[in-house]
A protein has these predicted regions:
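Beta-strand repeat architectures
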Residues: 82-148, 345-347, 352, 360-414, ...
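Glycine-centric low-complexity/flexibility signal
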Residues: 47, 52-56, 60-64, 68-78, ...
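N-linked glycosylation sites
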Residues: 37, 75, 89-90, 96, ...
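N-terminal signal peptide
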Residues: 19-58
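Extracellular, surface-exposed repeat/solenoid domains
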Residues: 302-324, 737, 766-786, 790-792
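Low-complexity basic/metal-binding stretches
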Residues: 6-7, 11-12, 827-830, 835-848
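Classical eukaryotic N-terminal signal peptides for Sec-dependent ER targeting/secretion
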Residues: 1-20
Length: 852
C-alpha cells in the first residue's frame, strides 16, 4: 500500500511540473513583446480553421501590448479585473491589454468602458458572442477592435476612434434552419442571405448560388451569413458567412472606423460567403467610417447581407454597403446586393455599389401596416419580385437609379398581375421588367434614359397593363449618348392621368400592342419621340387589323365611341388619345388604327407626323391580284392598277367603301409564295366623332395613311427578273371637326403605293373625309378651313407597263345653303340672290343668274 501511495504522489508531482512548465512557456510566448497579429498562432491555439477576417479588415500588429487568453463561466458577467483592466464597469473600466477568448463573454455594469488604442477583444470563432451592456459610454481608441462571430453592445454613447473596428466578418455560425443559403453542388457558387450568391455555370437557364432568407426580419436582422459552395468533394465549402453585430445606443454612435459583418473569401477554389447582419439603434449616427455586410469574393461571389439602421439622423459621409462579392470565375456576375433598411424612415435600399451582376435580389411580401416610405434600387442592383399577384406599395418614392433593375414575375410564367403604388416612380439609367400585367398608380412618373418593358407572353389571358399617373409623366433622354426612355408592352397598354404627359427626348417612346392615352390635359410628343401601336412585327399588326380586313364593315366604336376611355380586345383602335385637352405632336404618332377621341385641339408641328402608312391590311377587300407572273395593285378609294409582265395582265383590286363616311383600311397584295413577301395597305386615322368633334386641327407637318410600295426585285432560278407585286392601296383619314388649318406647306395624303419591278400595278388611292360639325352662319360667315398645304389622294405609279392606281376620294359633309365644296366656302352670288330658294354650287348659281 505504501508503495502504491509513493507511486501516485510521484506521478502527481510530475504532472504538476509539466503543467506549470507549459503555462510558463505559454505566458512567455504570448507576452514577449514580439510583433503579433490577430491570426498568428491562434488557429492552433483555439482549434480554429479558416480565415479570421475578410481581406478588408485585417487586424493590425499588437506590438508592445500585453495579451492573454481567457475562458469565463457561461451566463456570468465578467469584471474589469477579469480582463486585466483598470477600474470597474460600474465606474469606468480601461482595457489596456488584448484578450483572446475561447468562449462567449458577457460584460455588464452601470459605468463606462474604454478600450485603449491598439487593444483588441477577440473571440475569432464561428458563432462566438461578445456582449457588452453598460449604462454609460463605450469608447474604442485608435486601432482598437472587438472581433467575434456575434457582437452585442448596449451603451449610452459609442465612440469608435480612427481605424477602430467592430468585426464579425467570416465568423458566422449556422444560418437559420430550413434555409438554402449555402449552394448545393460543387460549382463554387456563392452563399446567399440578403442577396443571392452568384453562380458561374454557363447554360441557357437562369442560375444562382445560395438563395436568400430572413426577408421577414430585414428591419431587425439577426441571422448569420451562409458559406459559399466548394468546387470539389474534398473542399465542400468556400468562404464562411458573415457574423452578426447589434449596437443599441441611447444617444450618439460615432463611427470613424468600421462595423463589418462581411462574408469570407472563397478564393478560386470556392464561392464567397454571404454577408451577415448588422442592426443599429441610435438617435444620432455620425462619422466618416464604414458599415458593411458585403458578400465575400470567390469563384462565385457571395450575396450581400442585411443592415438595418434605426437612427433619427444619419451623417451622409458614412459608407454603408451590402454589395455582392466579386466573382473570379465570371467577373461580370458578382453576388447580388443585400438589403439596407432605414428603420426610422421605413425605407429600403438595395445597392450593389456599381459592382456588375446578373444575379438577383428577391424582394418578397411588402409591409402594409405600416407602409414603407421609400424603396431605392441603384448602382447595378438587380431586384426581383417573384411572387404572383404581388403588390408593392409605399408612401413615398420608388426609385431605380444608375444601372439598377426591378423585375416583376418570372419569364417562364407571364400570367400574373403586379401592382406598384407610390407617390412617385423615378427611373434614371435603369430598367423595370414585368412578366405579366402591370398596374401602376403614382402621382408622378419621371424617366431619364430608362425603360419599362412589359411582356405578357403569348397568352390572351393576361389583362391590360394600366399606368395611372395623376399629375406628371415625363420621358426624357437626359444624355444624348445614352439610351432613350421607353415604355413598351406586347399586350394592351393604357396610361391615365390628370396632368401632363411629355415625351421630350429623341428616341423616347411609348409602344404597345394596343395603346390608350387618356385624361391628361396635355400630351406632348417631342421631336424624335414616338407613340406607336401596334408593334413593328406583322403578327402584332395582324392581331389588331384582322377583324377589319376579313369583312367589309365599319367599326361603329370609332364613329360613335363610348363616353369613357378604356382599352380591351373588343375595341377597334390600335392607338387611342381619349379625353385629352390638347395634343401637340413634334415627333411621330404611328398606328394601324389611330383614334383621337374627345380632344379639344390637335397641333401637328412642322417636324411632326401622325401616320398610319403601310399599317393596314396584308390582304383585305381590295386585295391586289397576282396572276400569270404579274401583280396588280390593291384597290380602295380607287381601283388598283393592272400589272403587266411579258404581255400578261393581272387585274388590280376593286374599289370599296363609302366616300361620304369612309371607315375602312387599305388593302395589300401578296405573291404566290413567301419569297415574294407582301405589301401592306394604309391604315386609318379618325379624329373626333359625330357626338364629340374636334375643335381644331392645326397641321404644319404631315398626316398620312399611304399604301406600301413594292421595291424588291424578284429573280427566277436562272437569274432573270420576274413580275413584281403591285402597290398597296391608301387608307382612310376621317376627321370630325369644327376647324381645319393646313399651314406652312403641310402634307395630308392617302396615296397608293407604287408597283414593284417588273410590271407591278400601282395601288389605288385611299379616302379623306371632312365631317364638319358646326359652320357659323348666324351673323357672319366663319371659314372652317385655311388651306395652304397639299392634299394627295392619287394612286400609286405602275412599274414599266404596269398601270397607275386610280385616284381616291376627298369629300366633305354636305354644306348648308349658300356654301359649297369640300370646305363649305361661301358662294357669294348664290348666297345673296338665291339662298332662300337654292342650294346649288356656285357655277350653277352663276349660270342661272346670267340666264335670268
Amino acid at each position: 500500500m505504501e508503495v502504491v501511495m509513493q507511486f501516485v504522489v510521484m506521478h502527481w508531482n510530475l504532472w504538476c511540473c509539466i503543467l506549470l512548465g507549459y503555462l510558463q512557456i505559454s505566458c512567455i510566448s504570448l507576452s514577449s513583446g514580439h510583433h503579433l497579429n490577430r491570426s498568428t498562432g491562434l488557429e492552433n491555439w483555439l482549434g480554429y480553421s479558416g480565415s479570421l477576417v475578410g481581406d478588408d479588415s485585417l487586424l493590425y500588429d499588437s506590438a508592445f501590448v500585453e495579451t492573454s487568453t481567457s475562458s469565463f463561466p457561461l451566463n456570468e458577467s465578467v469584471s474589469c479585473e477579469d480582463l486585466e483592466g483598470v477600474g470597474s464597469f460600474n465606474t469606468t473600466c480601461l482595457l489596456s491589454s488584448t484578450h483572446y477568448l475561447k468562449s462567449d463573454i458577457y460584460i455588464y455594469g452601470v459605468g463606462n468602458l474604454e478600450i485603449l488604442s491598439d487593444v483588441s477583444l477577440l473571440c475569432p470563432m464561428e458563432g462566438c458572442m461578445i456582449t457588452v451592456n453598460v449604462s454609460g459610454n463605450v469608447k474604442l481608441g485608435q486601432d482598437a477592435s472587438i472581433v467575434s462571430g456575434s457582437v452585442v453592445l448596449s451603451a449610452a454613447n459609442l465612440t469608435m476612434g480612427y481605424n477602430s473596428y467592430i468585426d464579425s466578418s467570416s465568423l458566422g455560425g449556422s444560418p437559420p434552419s430550413q434555409t438554402s443559403g449555402t449552394p448545393v453542388g460543387n460549382d463554387g457558387a456563392g452563399g446567399g442571405h440578403g442577396g443571392r450568391g452568384a453562380s458561374c455555370l454557363k447554360n441557357n437557364k437562369t442560375n444562382w448560388g445560395g438563395d436568400v432568407y430572413a426577408w421577414s426580419t430585414l428591419s431587425e436582422p439577426w441571422s448569420y451569413g451562409s458559406k459559399g459552395g466548394g468546387k470539389s468533394t474534398k473542399k465542400q465549402y468556400g468562404g464562411n458567412g458573415g457574423g452578426r453585430v447589434k449596437l443599441l445606443v441611447k444617444d450618439t454612435l460615432y463611427v470613424n472606423g468600421s462595423i463589418t459583418a462581411k462574408g469570407g473569401d472563397g478564393g478560386s477554389d470556392g464561392g464567397g460567403g454571404s454577408g451577415g447582419s448588422i442592426l443599429v439603434h441610435a438617435v444620432k449616427l455620425k462619422g466618416y467610417g464604414i458599415i458593411s455586410a458585403a458578400g465575400g469574393t470567390g469563384w462565385g461571389g457571395g450575396g450581400g447581407g442585411r443592415i438595418s439602421l434605426d437612427c433619427y439622423s444619419i451623417q451622409e459621409d458614412l459608407n454603408i454597403t451590402v454589395h455582392g462579392g466579386l466573382s473570379i470565375g465570371c467577373p461580370g456576375n458578382s453576388g447580388a446586393a443585400g438589403t439596407y433598411f432605414n428603420a426610422h424612415l421605413l425605407s429600403l435600399k438595395v445597392s450593389n455599389d456599381n459592382v456588375t451582376t446578373e444575379t438577383e435580389t428577391p424582394l418578397l411580401d411588402f409591409s402594409t401596416s405600416p407602409l414603407w416610405s421609400n424603396v431605392y434600387v441603384e448602382n447595378n442592383a438587380k431586384v426581383l419580385v417573384p411572387l404572383v399577384w404581388s403588390r408593392v406599395q409605399v408612401r413615398g418614392q420608388i426609385s431605380v437609379y444608375s444601372g439598377g433593375s426591378l423585375i416583376f414575375g418570372l419569364s417562364d410564367y407571364p400570367i400574373s398581375e403586379f401592382e406598384l403604388v407610390a407617390e412617385e416612380l423615378l427611373l434614371s439609367d435603369s430598367i423595370i421588367k414585368v412578366f405579366g400585367a402591370f398596374r401602376v398608380s403614382v402621382k408622378m412618373l419621371l424617366m431619364w434614359d430608362s425603360s419599362i418593358q412589359i411582356d405578357g407572353g403569348e397568352s390572351t389571358v393576361v389583362t391590360a397593363s394600366v399606368l395611372e399617373v395623376r399629375n406628371l409623366a415625363v420621358l426624357r433622354d437626359f444624355l444624348p449618348s445614352q439610351q432613350n426612355s421607353v415604355i413598351s408592352s406586347n399586350t394592351n397598354l393604357a396610361l391615365y392621368g390628370q396632368g401632363l404627359l411629355q415625351l421630350t427626348g429623341d428616341g423616347d417612346a411609348i409602344k404597345g400592342q394596343r395603346l390608350s392615352l387618356s385624361l391628361f390635359y396635355n400630351v406632348t410628343v417631342g421631336p424624335g419621340s414616338l407613340l406607336q401601336a401596334p408593334l413593328d412585327d406583322d403578327a402584332s399588326r395582324g392581331s389588331v387589323t384582322k377583324h377589319l380586313c376579313d369583312t367589309q364593315r365599319c367599326p361603329i366604336d370609332l364613329i360613335t365611341p363610348p363616353d369613357d376611355c378604356h382599352v380591351n380586345y373588343t375595341l377597334s383602335f390600335s392607338l387611342q388619345i381619349c379625353r385629352v385637352e390638347d395634343l401637340l405632336v413634334n415627333g411621330i404618332m404611328k398606328g394601324s388604327i389611330i383614334h383621337i377621341h374627345r380632344a379639344r385641339t390637335v397641333i401637328v408641328d412642322t417636324d411632326g407626323m401622325i401616320t398610319a402608312s403601310e399599317l393596314g391590311c396584308t390582304e383585305g377587300i381590295g386585295k391586289g391580284n397576282f396572276l400569270n407572273g404579274a401583280g396588280g395593285g390593291a384597290g380602295h378609294g380607287g381601283k388598283g392598277g393592272s400589272g403587266y409582265f411579258n404581255g400578261r395582265e393581272s387585274i388590280g383590286g376593286s374599289e370599296y367603301g363609302n366616300a361620304i363616311l369612309p371607315c375602312e383600311l387599305g388593302s395589300g397584295t401578296e405573291g404566290p409564295n413567301e419569297s415574294y413577301g407582301h405589301v401592306v395597305g394604309g391604315g386609318m386615322i379618325v379624329m373626333g366623332s359625330i357626338q364629340w368633334p374636334l375643335l381644331r386641327l392645326d397641321l404644319y407637318g404631315s398626316l398620312r395613311a399611304d399604301g406600301e410600295s413594292f421595291s424588291k426585285s424578284i429573280k427566277s432560278s436562272d437569274g432573270s427578273s420576274v413580275g413584281g407585286l403591285g402597290g398597296g392601296s391608301g387608307g382612310t383619314v376621317l376627321l370630325f371637326l369644327q376647324e381645319l388649318r393646313l399651314l406652312e406647306n403641310p402634307y395630308l395624303s392617302v396615296v397608293g403605293g407604287n408597283g414593284g419591278p417588273v410590271g407591278g400595278g400601282g395601288g389605288g388611292g385611299g379616302r379623306i373625309h371632312f365631317h364638319w360639325s358646326k359652320i357659323g352662319m348666324e351673323e357672319e360667315y366663319v371659314p372652317v378651313a385655311s388651306i395652304t398645304g397639299t392634299m394627295n389622294n392619287s394612286g400609286g405609279a405602275g412599274d414599266n407597263d404596269g398601270r397607275h392606281g386610280q385616284e381616291g376620294t376627298i369629300t366633305g359633309k354636305a354644306c348648308p345653303k349658300g356654301l359649297y365644296g369640300i370646305f363649305c366656302e361661301v358662294c357669294f352670288i348664290c348666297f345673296f340672290l338665291f339662298s332662300s330658294s337654292y342650294s346649288w354650287i356656285c357655277s350653277e348659281c352663276w349660270r342661272y343668274a346670267v340666264i335670268s
